[in-house]
């Protein structure tokens, strides 16, 4: 019996879908924090202003039209790879000596480390570890990486901070320290797209009823609302914790004020009174809940087949189950992602930004 159970367990495990990528819960928390939209880091390199902005996390490697150079750093025994575009490397070199030809190793490492010495000193002070540039060479490191927009004086370019490996364990100290430093930058929530769909509910009345009354209710019983603006030709429109009123004109609803915060709009019996003209704040809008649905596919089916489908019916997906997952909000696809393992559970890793915050 034990042998049979072991064999059955082995078969079951082989049939369970296993994502190509496994992330530990700690790594997921770190990724979500590092990829958050924040204000730029601002400082100076020599006599030139420096600005570094986080552009997001890139999972699928993208070739660069502009030559990139891997700058391999050692922070207290841990390796960190930061790739910079050639114009950025040249801009850093010019802060040490203008007109200097593009250097080769080991000169390149020495000059870049000298150019970044004030920033290096600040990082060493905050981490209590030594930071040293090991080498600079042609970019060969592959995704995933955090994409950076870097501006040095009049020169702008891309930077790539490559993630550690593996991603199913602990976050290395160097990257934890980086997240702590970035956490000091103010968050800047991305603007919501005006095309993001939300669901508005039209409410015609409310009724306070006891559980005993509901248990006794049967077919044919009539329920009389306590509050029913519908009898006055009005309907309450609600989305999340926001509401407004509208007049019913034929098969149209005409708004009679902006949406504003109120937890239970129909508990206010005086809907015809003059309402506050204050529009909802960003915080009010942020509280609106939007259900995200993760879809592995859609396919047409006839009503006849649907009626006859019973236990054991087989639907053909027409695509591999480990393909891209559609992220749907109120019927609209706003993004795509890959299935990944997070500890004992499955999650969805975004392939790009959601359409609602482009």
UniProtKB/Swiss-Prot annotation:
InterPro entries: FliN-like_C (IPR001543), FliN_T3SS_HrcQb (IPR001172), SpoA-like_sf (IPR036429), T3SS_SpaO/YscQ/SpaO (IPR013385). One of its GO terms (cellular component) is bacterial-type flagellum basal body. GO terms for biological process: bacterial-type flagellum-dependent swarming motility; positive chemotaxis; protein secretion by the type III secretion system. It holds the Pfam family FliMN_C. The keyword Transport applies. GO terms for molecular function: cytoskeletal motor activity. Keywords: Plasmid, Transport. Belongs to the FliN/MopA/SpaO family. Could be involved in the secretion of an unknown factor. This is Probable translocation protein Y4yK.
